[in-house]
Amino acid sequence: MAALTRDPQFQKLQQWYREHRSELNLRRLFDANKDRFNHFSLTLNTNHGHILVDYSKNLVTEDVMRMLVDLAKSRGVEAARERMFNGEKINYTEGRAVLHVALRNRSNTPILVDGKDVMPEVNKVLDKMKSFCQRVRSGDWKGYTGKTITDVINIGIGGSDLGPLMVTEALKPYSSGGPRVWYVSNIDGTHIAKTLAQLNPESSLFIIASKTFTTQETITNAETAKEWFLQAAKDPSAVAKHFVALSTNTTKVKEFGIDPQNMFEFWDWVGGRYSLWSAIGLSIALHVGFDNFEQLLSGAHWMDQHFRTTPLEKNAPVLLALLGIWYINCFGCETHAMLPYDQYLHRFAAYFQQGDMESNGKYITKSGTRVDHQTGPIVWGEPGTNGQHAFYQLIHQGTKMIPCDFLIPVQTQHPIRKGLHHKILLANFLAQTEALMRGKSTEEARKELQAAGKSPEDLERLLPHKVFEGNRPTNSIVFTKLTPFMLGALVAMYEHKIFVQGIIWDINSFDQWGVELGKQLAKKIEPELDGSAQVTSHDASTNGLINFIKQQREARVQ
């Protein structure tokens, strides 16, 4: 594929941007077209609620959207989409298919990898998860002293942690009757020490989530958990009742003391950051029940079907991806804010930090050459309204343009005080996108200050500070209610957005070589931290840091 910057469709887009950028004023665009909302919004209707994607507050015209869709076609998005769904090995650096869509393929249509249908294996693992969840949640599964399981501790990192953690937080209202869940990821001993201090070994079940069962952070934490458990249980055979594995390495799992019957498998065509739909989601299913886990899968499958079959110009993941391309590759935007107005989604932005930045944080193309354009953005965000009192100042009046996605459910899980809290939340959600779009003109600010009774001197002094330029782009994503189905659909929508952008940039969204170098160096440095000898084998900075740490380790601190 030709480089993006040499694609005639991209060059056409860039030329339009250079010639017409100054005309893109959102106030004027809305004034000129009273039907703008209808032209630049989509409503996705499911049997489990509706999703409105309003992209009318973006710096686009119908010409721009047409050119963006033409660019997607020119870059081969439709063909690439089919290659993914057909099980082709689109993860070309690792020679793997990319089939998280198979994990939630509720239609159960055959999906082939190397000529073999993967669906029987997928369904077999789902059946095993269902049976296990029923045993634990019903109290049939007992610990070594005969107690039922009250706490499930997922030990994993990256994709084996972020997805299940985000989902179990998001679906807390659906957890009735399930065990509590805890997540330990960090190698920092504080994480596991603080967690274990709150648990009873007799009623705790540990899930060790590691494909290879060799991930340093995960296995170190798992060994610590086992040591803690055996201090109480004494008998190593009790491990089998309190530890299960999500892995593909039967030998290592057995060595650890876990019964292979309690090993839940997944496959090399499941990438870590796309794995919550697999056995990696066992903690989700235990917490909210397998029926709700299936609803999560069904919502994602609904979005998969929408993504696969809907024309590009009406395709929610495609449109979100193209708007991102417009801002990143024409406007030079470097970050993207995800702002969910729902406290249950407080880990949503953190989840997609990995989802987006590990997928598209690449500068090498499929042909092995360096890109000559920007790729993945820095993704960040916090729940509203907390963010309004923290960083929205920079979004409104800072010097950087930050495209934002605002998300909110129409119905709350907690309609306390006759829905007052949620009405205030909705009002803030609506006000922010309007404020970012409209801003406040000098004349409007002047009238406001006059009405407040400011003296002419104070008015002129304050006036420039009270002006908002506006013209800040946002998407508003409004959905009926945050249910398991709806969460599945939203997560899949963003997954496919990331995929489309990777295709347009001609990078591999499904490897993560950038994770490797630091891990390699850490293995070399770890033994150098032993003893008191000065270290000189690195650059001056790294040597200095190591030697300071060694010196201070023995220092007495009051």
Curated annotation (Swiss-Prot):
PTM summary: Phosphorylation at Ser-185 by CK2 has been shown to decrease enzymatic activity and may contribute to secretion by a non-classical secretory pathway. ISGylated.
Pathway where this protein functions: Carbohydrate degradation; glycolysis; D-glyceraldehyde 3-phosphate and glycerone phosphate from D-glucose: step 2/4
Annotated effect of mutating Q343R: In CNSHA4; GPI Narita and Morcone
Chain positions with N6-malonyllysine modification: K454
This protein's record includes keyword Chaperone: no
Main location: cytoplasm
Residue positions, PTM N-acetylalanine: A2
The keyword ATP-binding is assigned to this record: no
Location of the protein in the cell: Cytoplasm; Secreted
Modified residues (N6-(2-hydroxyisobutyryl)lysine): K34
Residues modified to Phosphoserine: S107, S185, S455
Residues with Phosphothreonine modification: T109, T250
Outcome recorded upon mutating R75G: In CNSHA4; GPI Elyria
Pfam families tied to this protein: PGI
Keywords: Acetylation, Cytokine, Cytoplasm, Disease variant, Gluconeogenesis, Glycolysis, Growth factor, Hereditary hemolytic anemia, Hydroxylation, Isomerase, Phosphoprotein, Secreted, Ubl conjugation
Activity regulation: Strongly inhibited by erythrose 4-phosphate.
Catalytic activity: alpha-D-glucose 6-phosphate = beta-D-fructose 6-phosphate
Assigned EC number: 5.3.1.9
InterPro entries xrefs: G6P_Isomerase (IPR001672), G6P_Isomerase_C (IPR023096), Phosphoglucose_isomerase_CS (IPR018189), SIS_dom_sf (IPR046348), SIS_PGI_1 (IPR035476), SIS_PGI_2 (IPR035482)
Entry-annotated residues carrying N6-acetyllysine: K12, K142, K454
Annotated phenotype, changing S160P: In CNSHA4; uncertain significance
Disease in which the protein is involved: Anemia, congenital, non-spherocytic hemolytic, 4: An autosomal recessive form of anemia in which there is no abnormal hemoglobin or spherocytosis. It is caused by glucose phosphate isomerase deficiency.
Protein function: In the cytoplasm, catalyzes the conversion of glucose-6-phosphate to fructose-6-phosphate, the second step in glycolysis, and the reverse reaction during gluconeogenesis. Besides it's role as a glycolytic enzyme, also acts as a secreted cytokine: acts as an angiogenic factor (AMF) that stimulates endothelial cell motility. Acts as a neurotrophic factor, neuroleukin, for spinal and sensory neurons. It is secreted by lectin-stimulated T-cells and induces immunoglobulin secretion.
Subunit structure: Homodimer; in the catalytically active form. Monomer in the secreted form.
Name recorded for this polypeptide: Glucose-6-phosphate isomerase
Taxonomic source organism: Homo sapiens
